[in-house]
Structure formats: structure tokens, C-alpha cells
Design a protein with these regions (language model features):
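Short beta-strand segments
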Residues: 24-58, 74-75
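Broad gene-expression machinery/nucleic-acid interaction feature
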Residues: 26, 40-42, 71, 95-97, ...
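Charged, gly/pro-rich active-site loop segments
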Residues: 2-9, 81-158
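Structural motif corresponding to alpha-helix initiation and N-cap regions
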Residues: 14, 59-60
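Extreme N-terminal tail/first-helix region
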Residues: 1-23
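Short solvent-exposed loop/turn micro-motifs enriched in small/polar/acidic residues
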Residues: 22-24, 37-38, 87, 136
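Helix-adjacent hinge/juxtasegments
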Residues: 55, 61-91
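A generic structural signal for nonpolar/aromatic side chains embedded in well-ordered alpha-helices
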Residues: 21, 65-66, 116
Length: 158
């Protein structure tokens, strides 16, 4: 179903991929957009219990795209060091494929947005206040990961 990586020496382990998912701050979410065009958008997210969660408004391009087709892809660049004298980039990145689901259960939504808030802010009181302030306008999306892979520059392979 998913393609195998051609350059297997450069493939990251599953643990390396998950470590990147846990520490990265921003990902690019790719969706099936309007009129057959791809739609990609940066999102803040949290990796929790083997799934990806992000939040946003209850309506808009992202939510419409997910409702029309739940198949998504996420990419994250972990490292991108341009080495001018070698005319190359020492990179490390991951890509995942999965299915997005708009959460309906208040407990699931709260758990996800609380974890998301605490990923970016250590102040539990501030996170709780923000959740309460935005709750009625909040939409939370869960991505069930179906395929996860990562790759790094050959120069980084040990």
C-alpha cells in the first residue's frame, strides 16, 4: 500500500521517527484541497498515545478538506544544515500518512488540547484558562498513523 524507501541506508528507525514527532514544534499537514489541488498548511501538534492531535477553528479550509477526504500526510523537518562547500544539505525528516478524524467526545478533546497546550507552555493555569476561553469555538482533530518513515542525509548515517 505504501511505497518502500529506495535508499534504505538513509532510513530512520521507528524510534528515531517517534523521537522527532515528540520534539518537533511544527509540522506541515497535507490534505486534499479544493478542485483537485493539494492543500498544505503548517500546524502545531502534539504526539499522544501513538496519534497526532491538532486544533483549530470549527470551520475553514482544513476542516472542509478533512470532511471531504480524511486521508492526510504530515511532514516534519528535524534538521536542515546547508553545507555550501559541498553543495548539499545535511537533512533529517519524517513523513507520515494517516486518517484524520474530527473529535466529538468532550473528554477526548480536552485531553488532546490540554496535552497540546502543555507541550508549548509549562503554565498549567494559563493552559486551562485558554482552553476554557476557547472551548466553544474549538475543533480538535486526531490523526491515526497508518505509515511512518524517516530519512536522513547519507552524511549523517553512522
Amino acid at each position: 500500500m505504501f511505497r518502500e524507501m529506495r535508499r534504505k541506508k538513509q532510513k530512520l528507525t521507528e524510534k528515531q521517527c517517534i523521537d522527532i514527532l515528540k520534539k518537533a514544534k511544527t509540522a506541515t499537514l497535507a490534505l486534499h484541497g479544493d478542485d483537485g489541488y493539494p492543500y498544505s498548511v503548517p500546524v502545531n501538534y502534539v504526539y499522544l498515545d501513538g496519534k497526532i492531535y491538532f486544533h483549530g477553528a470549527k470551520s475553514g479550509h482544513k476542516i472542509d478538506a478533512i470532511k471531504n477526504n480524511p486521508k492526510v500526510s504530515i511532514s516534519i523537518i528535524d534538521q536542515e544544515d546547508v553545507i555550501e562547500e559541498e553543495l548539499t544539505t545535511y537533512f533529517r525528516s519524517i513523513i507520515l500518512f494517516g486518517k484524520a478524524k474530527i473529535l466529538q467526545d468532550d473528554d477526548e478533546i480536552y485531553q488532546a488540547v490540554n496535552a497540546l497546550g502543555l507541550k508549548y507552555c509549562n503554565d498549567e493555569v494559563a493552559v486551562e484558562k485558554e482552553i476554557q476561553r476557547e472551548w466553544k469555538n474549538l475543533c480538535c482533530v486526531e490523526i491515526i498513523i497508518e505509515h511512518l518513515t524517516g530519512k536522513q542525509a547519507i552524511e549523517l548515517v553512522k
